[in-house]
Amino acid sequence: MGLIQENHRYSYSQLQSVSECPYGFYLQKIEKADGLVQNAFASQGTLIHDILDEWAKGILTIDQMPQEYERRYPLEVTQSWPRVLAVKGYAQKAFDLGYAYLKNFDGFPGYRIVDAEQKFETDIFGRPFVGIIDMLLEDEETGDLIVLDHKSKSLTAFKKAEDEMYKQQYLYAKHVFEKYDKWPKRLMFNLFKEGGLKRERPFKQDEYE
């Protein structure tokens, strides 16, 4: 059997894995090899993603978000942090950064939430592609659509991978056009470990093509 299955539906992270190490992708996603586990960084990111999604859908109020994070953190972030970080007290720092972000969260003023955690399937270069748009926003003044992705990266780490991050947004923009018959005007990232710092670029048709 080949490492890449014809009928497999790819996410953006999986496309990256295939590009960087096809065999590693095969073991993790196709064979589901033992020993390849979620890490604490990913678990914390998933928890904050989920809480933001529940707020966007009206399941949680803004006031409930930090308490929900505090309650679920020990239940969902169960992995150990890397030793080199743990000895420096990073585990507590990571928790505190997430809590502070949610405690000070004030929504997305000036924007209307069109959809949250929007899962979709489309075709990329003849292969099935599956993605999840964290939030699709509409500018209340202009009516422009904005693709928003929540990221747990620090600003330094984000800058190192910034161009690659925006490639993901361009793939998501394809779905926005297919569903809403117009392209998003802006591609935005919400860096919640940086207090909700926003990084964005305008959508450019020539870069998409």
What are these regions (language model features)?
Residues 2, 6-20, 127-138:
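An acidic intrinsically disordered interaction segment
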Residues 9, 39, 160-163:
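Short, solvent-exposed segments of well-ordered alpha helices
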Residues 18-26, 60-78, 184-194:
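Short, compositionally biased low-complexity segments
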Residues 50-119, 123:
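A non-catalytic, helix-rich entry segment at domain boundaries
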Residues 111-114, 118-209:
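Mg2+/Mn2+-dependent nuclease catalytic core
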